[in-house]
Regions:
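Catalytic cores of histone-lysine modification enzymes
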Residues: 1-89, 152-153
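C-terminal SET catalytic tail plus cysteine-rich post-SET Zn-binding segment of SAM-dependent SET-domain
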Residues: 81-157
């Protein structure tokens, strides 16, 4: 399947469908070089305010990331949205982008990045450090997963 990479209203470059894509279709594999999390961390500091948190890193598991700046394809330009039309499927350290619903020709492909971060961050921190520009109706304001809230303890008789 050929995809079109062009300017996006969300941020920078985006990937657009050049034809209709049916729900459930595997659209593209996210390719690049497998690197350790330590190597990925050395490439970017979480709290560097001068950086727009723009990387081509995709965490595959607890050990490795795919660095799409090295041997990556069009998938590295797929933007985030809090209302995605695509989802990620990880199989044996390979990452595939699948259509969550039918996608029309010319529509931008987007998935929820759902960044995992330090649990000490508040939503205000996440919105400041990882701001979202998707403008979806239900936008949570950040590319990151919301912090987990402790469950209230239930008193049992």
């Amino acid at each position: 399947m050929s995809l079109e990479v062009r300017r996006s209203g969300i941020q920078g470059q985006g990937v657009f469908a050049d034809r209709r894509i049916r729900k459930g279709k595997c659209i593209i594999e996210y390719t690049g070089e497998l690197i350790s999390h330590e190597e990925a961390d050395a490439q970017c500091a979480d709290d560097d305010p001068s950086r727009e948190h723009h990387t081509f890193l995709f965490a595959v598991d607890d050990e490795v990331c795919i660095d799409a700046s090295r041997g990556g394809n069009e998938a590295r330009f797929i933007n985030h949205s809090c209302d995605p039309n695509c989802e990620i499927v990880i199989e044996e350290r390979r990452v595939f982008i699948h259509a969550l619903r039918d996608i029309v020709r010319g529509e931008e492909l987007v998935y929820d990045y759902w960044y995992t971060t330090d649990e000490s961050y508040t939503m205000a921190d996440l919105r400041r450090i990882y701001p979202c520009r998707c403008e979806a109706t239900k936008c949570r304001g950040t590319l990151a997963r919301p912090p987990r809230r402790p469950r209230p303890k239930v008193k049992r008789p």
